[in-house]
């Protein structure tokens, strides 16, 4: 199976999903300034890092961004190199399946063979060179037939917050090429016991949420598994071919009618039921030091390199003002600009302060910070979310 290819040989359109609200990164992440437009681990924002990561694979004119009406102007400011009409704002949040379908149907009309890459806006990748190698191989594989390519990250722990991919047979390739595996099935966020079994088996990888498929393959997969959504997308795509004004009118009217469903549940899981020999779903190894930065604990691990370290962002540990003093304390994450923070005899805490809010939790419970946002919403405190 040929999977070699290059940027010049293959038409490639990266689609960056940037519509999430990032509630688990409250209080820094808010509706109008969600985590994908924040510089959480450096000077560049998450979405800027994503575009830079894709630069060796596609020109900026080929990139699309799907976001919401609270973030689209800010994203346009942060990404001046991306065409403004390629930054689409969803009229309603509908999860990843409608967003992927939108890209597929819009591009199918004029570029059916173009490979679409779906990339979340809020991931971090330390090994950029390996990332480009893997994605380039995936582009070529997706372009060589009616194939869906997913990237699977080798698990380092029994994580219950990720989806898992069960790997099937290895596909024979020429010497030096990256060998894909067929996919047996997808399992979304297993319980702790099942996650332990998956990792122990050595035959499962984390689902990185990065997918590659031609525009035609993507659109046809939606037609097969989500026929109602497909009809809605046909109307949107037809309007897009008419005029910008007509597109915006129909998009606003029709898109909210789509089911709120992830692409995993909508397409990948039902397609995998066909069996690995017929589903034409392939997995390439995402061995490029990946982190989805799903919560404050994940950011601590990404920044620290090893969990026992204290990590301070916007504070400096015992070096200069503002500073963070640590006495008999390890594994803590601190973000409190302009404040002196003292940690005495505490371990594995997350301390995050903004102008109007203070969060204190444990790293273990940082996955649950989104519940704070839910409580604020029910209390009518929209000013804090």
Where are these regions (language model features)?
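Left-handed beta-helix
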Residues: 1-11, 215-385
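Short coil/turn connectors at secondary-structure junctions
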Residues: 10-12, 60-61, 83-84, 111-114, ...
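Conserved core of the sugar-phosphate nucleotidyltransferase
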Residues: 128-253, 280, 363
């Amino acid at each position: 199976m040929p999977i070699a290819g290059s940027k010049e040989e293959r038409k490639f359109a990266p689609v960056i999903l940037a519509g999430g609200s990032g509630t688990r990164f409250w209080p820094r992440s808010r509706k109008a300034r969600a985590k994908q437009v924040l510089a959480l681990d450096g000077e560049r924002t998450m979405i800027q890092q994503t575009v830079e990561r894709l630069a060796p694979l596609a020109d900026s004119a080929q990139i699309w961004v799907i976001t919401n009406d609270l973030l689209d102007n800010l994203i346009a400011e942060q990404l001046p190199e991306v065409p403004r009409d390629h930054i689409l704002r969803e009229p309603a949040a509908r999860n990843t399946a409608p967003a992927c379908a939108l890209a597929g149907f819009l591009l199918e009309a004029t570029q059916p063979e173009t490979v679409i890459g779906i990339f979340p806006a809020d991931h971090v990748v330390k090994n950029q060179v390996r990332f480009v190698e893997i994605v380039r191989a995936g582009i070529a594989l997706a372009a060589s037939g009616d194939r869906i390519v997913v990237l699977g990250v080798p698990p380092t722990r029994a994580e219950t917050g990720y989806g898992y991919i069960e790997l099937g047979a290895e596909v024979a390739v020429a010497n030096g090429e990256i060998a894909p595996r067929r996919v047996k099935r997808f399992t979304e966020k297993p319980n702790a016991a099942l996650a332990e079994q998956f990792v122990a088996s050595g035959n499962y990888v984390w689902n990185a949420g990065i997918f590659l498929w031609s525009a035609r393959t993507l659109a046809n997969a939606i037609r097969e598994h989500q026929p109602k959504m497909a009809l809605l997308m046909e109307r949107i795509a037809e309007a897009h071919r008419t005029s910008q004004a007509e597109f915006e009118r129909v998009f606003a009217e029709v898109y909210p009618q789509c089911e709120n469903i992830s692409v995993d549940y909508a397409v990948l899981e039902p397609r995998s039921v066909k069996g690995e020999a017929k589903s034409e779903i392939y997995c390439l190894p995402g061995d490029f030091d990946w982190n989805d930065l799903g919560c404050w604990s994940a950011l601590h691990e990404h920044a620290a390199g090893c969990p026992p370290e204290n990590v301070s962002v916007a504070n400096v540990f015992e070096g200069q003002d503002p500073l963070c003093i640590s006495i008999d304390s390890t594994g803590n994450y601190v973000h409190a600009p302009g404040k002196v923070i003292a940690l005495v005899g505490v371990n594995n805490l997350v301390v995050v302060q903004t102008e109007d809010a203070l969060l204190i939790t444990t790293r273990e419970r940082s996955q649950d910070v989104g519940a704070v946002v839910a409580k604020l919403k029910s209390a009518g405190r929209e000013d804090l979310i």
